[in-house]
Structures are given as C-alpha cells and as structure tokens.
A protein has these predicted regions:
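Beta-propeller-forming repeat regions
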Residues: 1-391
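C-terminal outer-membrane/trafficking sorting elements
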Residues: 391-445
C-alpha cells in the first residue's frame, strides 16, 4: 500500500464584495472520480469548490507515492477562465457563448449542488458535468448552457433515438425557465420550460412508462406552461405529457424485475406508470403491508428532507439495485436491502457500465442523486439474451426494410467501433427507413 502525501494551497477568497464567501458560497464543495486520461490510465480525483459564483476544479493524480496536479480550472468570471497545467503554467481562455444566451459562458455561477461524470463526447476520456456547464478532460470548457445554479441533475440515454447522452437539469435561479434537457456533449437545448420565476428544487428523469419510448422527466415546476405549475411526467423524445400522476422526485431504482425504473423515496419504493402508483411493500411506516418495524428493523434515509439512501448501487451483480439505510436504533449498523422479486432478464452487472460506475462514485456528493446507465436498457435487454428459456443463444432478430444506419455496442452497452476481434460478441442497433429500430447480437468468428 502507498500512502498519499502532499498538500496544495487553495485560492482562499472571502468577502461579500465579490460574493465568493457571502452566505457560505465559497465553502460549497463537490468531488468525483474521472478517467481524464482514458480508461486505460489511472483515474483522477477531481475536487471542486464553489458553484453559486466562483468555481474551482482541481484534478489530481496519485502515482503510488505522491499527489500530482493534472490541472486546476478557475472560473472567476462569466466570460473568461484560467487553466493551470501540471507544470504550473496558467493560461486564460475566452469560451464560446452559452447556448441559452444568458451570458454565463464559463463554469462561473453554472454549478449544481451535485455533478456527474461520463465520456459524453466519445473521445475515450471523461468529462465533468457541472449542471449548466461542462468541463472537458483537459480542464478546458466543453460548453456552457448558462441557466445557472440547480438542485438536481440526471445524465443518461434519455432519448435513445438520437446519438449520445442527454442531461436533465432543474434550476433554482427563479429565471425564465425552471428546467431544461440538453445534449450532454454540446449543450444544445432540446427542451426547456417550467413556471417562470420559480425556485425549482426537485426533479427526476427515469424510464417509468413502458409504452412511452425513452425517459420521462418531471420536476416541482415542470411542464411547458410558464404560468401554471405541472408535476406530471413528460417524455424526453416527444416532449409530450405522458401521465396524470405526480411521481416522487428523489431516486430511480431497478427493483421489480422489468426493464423500467421504479422510484425510491426515503424508505419507500413504488412502481409508477402513466396513471397509477403502486406501493411495492418496501417502506417503514405503512399499516397496510408488512413493514420494517414488524421485522424488528428501523431503517432511516439520510439528509433530512432530501430522504436519500446511504448508497444505492448494484452491489450483488444481478442488475437489480441494492439500497443501504442506517439503523435509527443503532446508528453504527447499516441495512442492505435487496429485491426478492424474480426477473426473466439477465443483464450484465450495472457496475460494468462506465457511466453507472462513475455515478456510484459521486452519488454521496452534496445533494445525492441516483446513478444512471449509459445506455437505454429496453433496447438492449433482449440482446443481452436475458430471457431465461433462451439465456445463452446468439440469434438474429427479424430484419425490417431498408437499413439506414448501424451502431455497435459491447455487452456493457458502450459504443464501440466496427468489431474486428475474431471471437468478439457484440450488439448492433439498426435504424430502418420506416422509423423502427431493431437490435441484433452477433458472434464474429
């Protein structure tokens, strides 16, 4: 084992005049792990300070003996920023204008109470998703959306019919728009809305409606009407309202064995569709079903009204996720709760998916958020050959009319180039002239 040693001075600004430390704004911290040099290198730790105004992100590597700076990003203004490299050389940059036109073109004032990590631009290296802005793997700006500070962030393949990943972000700025959904690689705004002038403190994106392709998204001030409040789910592909219920706005979770998300809030797990919500019997206080109390257990979520788990992740590898809560009767004890519901699908361990694994690493940061997969599970479940009565076969699905494009994936759902290995098993998604999408699994011999 090697012991890390070494300290580095922070830029310790204070004072109300520049707002850096006013109202504790200079003492807001985030952290994550990111493969900034590619997935074949060691990951870097990225330590972050400030997101209401000034924003500093320090990427540091450990070589087995010492901590070494990879880069230090400083966004002290809305229109310029600095990056210090590993040799201590600092360069000032002027980025492109933000996609919202709000004038916040850097990380300055664009940060959330949370962050995300993933290779959103497909270059093999991770980017840092800040909320209304994103940082490239080299510490330079990838883009800025510019809607400002937010409370919730969700990164995933929300629209499986367009390339890349999407980001759903809710905004606390009380501005013209309370939320937006944008391209995670470019910052292009795909949808935006919500009640004008609202402090939108809650929001979630998840695939909860089986008959509606893609994710749904909803928030405390959702919808597209600036004058009225709407908390119903909307579809990320079409932008249309797809439900009359108000789902919980906390964590998504794979629990009951189908390929849609369930919802976790506090110590309750529910199944939500476009028109109904079903309690799955995982809760602490309900009198109508078996409770933890009846089993002599007293679990609790964390973070007060945020009601988040100690951790949610696919710990045991069957692709359904476990939840960790703490024992209110004995805080030194933890409960690990796992689904006992059967499933017909066999899906690769979620921790093999890079986006999901990075999400588990940053999950306990500030306002905790759930991890998401880097692929759209309903498109891949059959390709994983997870159906029990045909669990190992490699078979082609029927081909439909003219093929317009092909996209290749490995068994973890990650994009790959055209397969060349002699015995590689891979998945191909084909888009057809009639608008349909088929998925096939191949073994190259």
């Amino acid at each position: 084992m090697s012991e890390a040693s070494g300290t580095f001075n922070w830029d310790d600004r204070s004072g109300k005049s520049d707002y850096a430390n006013y109202g504790n704004r200079g003492e807001r911290y985030l952290a994550c792990v990111a493969y900034l040099g590619g997935k074949e290198e060691r990951p870097s730790a990225v330590m972050c300070r400030g997101y209401y105004t000034f924003a500093y992100l320090w990427a540091v590597d450990f070589d087995g003996e010492k901590l070494k700076t990879r880069w230090l990003h400083s966004s002290n203004k809305k229109t310029t920023y600095q990056v210090m490299d590993a040799e201590g050389k600092q360069t000032t940059y002027t980025p492109a204008a933000c996609s919202s036109g709000m004038g916040r073109n850097t990380m300055y004032a664009n940060g959330n109470h949370n962050l995300s990590v993933g290779d959103v631009d497909g270059d093999g290296c991770d980017e840092i998703i800040w909320g209304s802005a994103a940082l490239d793997h080299d510490g330079k700006m990838l883009y800025a959306v510019g809607f400002g500070h937010g409370d919730a962030i969700h990164l995933g393949d929300m629209n499986p019919d367009r390339p890349g990943l999407e980001l759903f972000d809710v905004h606390e700025e009380k501005g013209e728009f309370a939320w937006d959904l944008h391209d995670a690689a470019t910052g292009e705004i795909l949808w935006k809305g919500g009640q004008e002038g609202a402090d939108n403190g809650r929001g979630l994106a998840a695939d909860i409606v089986a008959g509606s392709r893609g994710y749904e998204f909803w928030s405390s001030y959702g919808g597209f009407d600036k004058a009225s409040r709407n908390q119903n789910p909307f579809n990320a592909v079409t932008g249309k309202e797809v439900g009359t219920r108000k789902p919980s706005m906390n964590f998504r979770i794979y629990w009951d064995g189908d390929v849609q998300d369930e919802l976790l809030d506090g110590t309750s797990i529910t199944k939500c569709t476009s028109s109904s919500t079903t309690d799955l019997g995982i809760h602490a206080t309900s009198t109508s079903k078996k409770t933890f109390a009846s089993l002599g257990m007293s679990p609790s979520s964390c973070n007060g009204t945020k009601a988040t788990p100690c951790l949610q992740a696919d710990l045991f590898g069957d692709w359904r996720e476990e939840v960790i809560w703490w024992n209110t009767s004995n805080p030194s004890q933890l409960y690990i709760v796992s689904s006992t519901t059967d499933t017909k699908y066999r899906v690769p361990t979620l921790m093999h998916d890079h986006l999901y694994r990075m999400g588990v690493a940053w999950q306990n940061c500030a306002y905790n958020q759930p991890p998401h997969l880097g692929y759209y599970l309903p498109d891949h479940a059959d390709s994983f050959q997870g159906v029990k009565d045909d669990a190992t076969a490699i078979a082609d699905l029927p081909q439909r009319n003219e093929i317009l494009s092909r996209t290749y994936y490995n068994l973890q759902g990650q994009h790959i180039a055209t397969p060349t290995n002699a015995t590689q098993v891979y998945i191909v998604k084909e888009r057809h002239a009639d608008g349909t999408v088929t998925t096939k699994k191949f073994l190259r011999r």
